[in-house]
Amino acid sequence: MTNRTYRVTEIVGTSPDGIDQAIRNGIERAGQTLRHIDWFEVTQVRGQVKDGTVEHYQVGLKLGFRLEDD
């Protein structure tokens, strides 16, 4: 196994369709600008309520991505 070094960044993924989709949306979007994303950690879960029903989900994530070797 090779030694790896990771950088960690925090994002918030959102979705009206649920927590799972908010995670997927956040990772998919981050993957457009970050390479080598290997793991995530959920740090927060919250949502927006409108007229007594859940309107939108927000999930705070830490993403770990590998630094490239020279």
Task: Please place each PLM-identified region on the residue numbering.
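Amphipathic alpha-helical hairpins
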Residues: 2-5, 9, 25, 44-46, ...
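Glycine-rich loops and low-complexity Gly/Arg-rich segments
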Residues: 34-38, 65-68
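A cross-kingdom feature marking charged/low-complexity
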Residues: 46-70
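Alpha-helical structural elements
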Residues: 1, 34-35, 52, 60
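Short, well-ordered alpha-helical segments
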Residues: 4-37
